[in-house]
Each structure stands twice: as structure tokens, then as C-alpha cells.
Amino acid sequence: MTETDGQKDNNQDTAQAAADPVVSKPYIMPDDPEEGSNEALVREAADARDKMLRTLAEMENLRKRTQKEVADARTYGVTSFARDVLDIADNLQRALDAVPAEARANAEPGLKALIEGVELTERSLLNALEKNGVKKFDPKGQKFDPNFQQAMYEVPDPSVPAGTVVQVVQAGFTIGDRVLRPALVGVAKGGAKAAPSDGGSETGNLN
């Protein structure tokens, strides 16, 4: 083959290549949906919604727990202090109980003023305690309840149902819905059996 022939062949090949169309592969966008991608997206959305709902539920539970802890701290934060103050209330009550009714009726002005001062002090102390959620209760006449009272002795008394509180040695106190100090009581025996209480416990009269 001569050099001229070789050049002709090359020229023919080049011309043929130029004449043939160039076909490229189609470009697929990275985010084009693939087979089954709709189901995957639905599952992901459902999982995300489930996680969001669980997170919201946990946040709501945390909020409620926090509110309860704050409320309990406000209500019961004075428990230790209130328990100490009860001794003062007891001493004031003992001082008043030590004065017979006849002596009060015939008391001289000075003694009468002293008694009234002690009574006023006791009322002020009980009011201050009540403002902080501490309430005094007297269960006399109520059916004995071990949740709120402590029986010190039994008293033969057939005139009332057995198990009735007939004497209160020491008043009880509650703080919030808890017993700060149970009442010390005497319970009747010998009478008819007390009827069962219907429902919640009775603390007696709250003062």
C-alpha cells in the first residue's frame, strides 16, 4: 500500500466517524425515585411521626412530674419545721386545759387577760400553720381510723359503738393530704359493733 493510499484510508475513517451520530447514556439524577422508594419514604415518614409523638409524650410526662415535684415542694417543704412548731401548740393547749372552767368564770381581770392572751396566741399559731397547709383535726365521736389516729387505751362505754373515739389525748395534724402527726385517742369498747365506714377515711373535725 502506498503512502497515498494510507492517507486515503485514514481520511475515509475520519469522515465515517464524523458522520456517525454520537449516542450517550441517559443521565439519571441522583434523587430520581427508584423502584420501591415510595414505600421507603412512607415508612420513614411514619417512623419520624412515631418518634415525634413519643418525644412529645415524654415531654408532657416530664412537665407533669416537674409540676408535681414543685407542688409537693411547696406543700411539704415546711414539714420538718411544722412538726417542731406542734410542740408549741401543744404547750399552749395544755396551759389552757390546766385552768378549770370554774376558775375561768371567776377569774380576776389579770388572770382573765392572761388566759385570753394564751387563747389568742394559740389561734394565731394555728392560723399561721393552716396558711402553710397544716391543719389540726379532732376525731372525737368518729370511728377509729388507724391511718389518722393512734389508740392509747380503751374506755368501757356501751352508749356508743365499739371502736368510736371517745377521748382525744392529743390532737392530730395533717399537711396537704398526708398525716403530719396522728391524733392520740381513747377508743370505746363494750358497745355495739361500729358500722363499716363507706369510702374514704375520716380525720374528724378540722379546725
UniProtKB/Swiss-Prot annotation:
InterPro entries given in the database record: GrpE (IPR000740), GrpE_coiled_coil (IPR013805), GrpE_head (IPR009012)
Positions of region (Disordered): 1-39
Location(s) in or outside the cell: Cytoplasm
Record-level Gene Ontology MF annotations: adenyl-nucleotide exchange factor activity; protein homodimerization activity; protein-folding chaperone binding; unfolded protein binding
Residue stretches of biased makeup (Basic and acidic residues): 1-11
Record's keyword annotation contains Iron-sulfur: no
CC annotations in GO: cytoplasm
Keywords: Chaperone, Cytoplasm, Stress response
UniProt family annotation: Belongs to the GrpE family.
Role, per record: Participates actively in the response to hyperosmotic and heat shock by preventing the aggregation of stress-denatured proteins, in association with DnaK and GrpE. It is the nucleotide exchange factor for DnaK and may function as a thermosensor. Unfolded proteins bind initially to DnaJ; upon interaction with the DnaJ-bound protein, DnaK hydrolyzes its bound ATP, resulting in the formation of a stable complex. GrpE releases ADP from DnaK; ATP binding to DnaK triggers the release of the substrate protein, thus completing the reaction cycle.
Listed name of the protein: Protein GrpE
Organism from which the protein derives: Rhodopseudomonas palustris (strain TIE-1)
